[in-house]
Amino acid sequence: MIVRMKNTFRMLLAAMLLSLFALPGYSWQKSFPEKDYVAYLFTYFTGNSGDEEAVRYAVSMDGYTYWALNDNEPVIDSKVISSTGGVRDPHILRCEDGKTFYMVVTDMVSANGWSSNRAMVLLKSTDLVNWSHSVINIQKRYSGQEDLKRVWAPQTIYDPEAGKYMVYWSMLHGDGADVIYYAYANAEFTDLEGEPKPLFLPENGKSCIDGDIVYKDGVFHLFYKTEGHGNGIKVATTRSLTSGAWTEEPDYKQQTKEAVEGAGTFKLIGQDKYILMYDVYLKGSYQF
């Protein structure tokens, strides 16, 4: 099924979005000419009730100051694309071909409880306006998931060793810790291939959520939130995504004493500099 936006908004997007730099995911293997990038696209949701749990767009010319599009209203109807009626944690990746975009979102209505969801949604587009979508319910899709409590914050990255797109997300089973898992998407980006496997868990065995992976100079950098033990953003690195050989950095990366989550890291256009942004969720704002 193809989800289409309202005509007035589609006209605006058609004029500008294809030359935007989608945040925070981007291709690591192929170097698309940065001269073709003119702005940054930010996808987000705004809260925990009603249509706040829906995909929105904002744009920026400098990577720091963003203007909401569509009067800060949803650009995709959550009730159409999800099984729960709400979506959270949107992430867009520009694919290796430079013209296809993958979006993944948490299929969840938080009013039903923080351990109520079992699914994510995979979306695909070539214009950032019209999206096909597929709901992946992990508990229904795979056996042995009877004690699954939640499926949170999926993201996508291209794995050069596998030659496939990896979807990774955090899951909680029973009374255990939230662990970041992964599975590869099929060629159509409509389903996952193989069983979900653990991608990362801190050496202390405690929960981690909101993984965000960025590749630079042969190294994959995983930014994650330490859930329930420090509640901040840390980083682990590896040269092979599925090797299990992660090196953890001990320090927290946020520059605030407030509780934070939802790290997103992206490169500034035309510069060898990166921005780490995160959600100061008790304040209702983002910080860089």
What are these regions (language model features)?
Residues 24-26:
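Sec/Tat signal peptide C-region and signal peptidase I cleavage site
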Residues 28-288:
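Carbohydrate-active catalytic/glycan-binding domains of CAZyme proteins
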Residues 12-22:
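Bacterial N-terminal signal peptides
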Residues 2-13:
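Bacterial N-terminal signal peptides that target proteins for export
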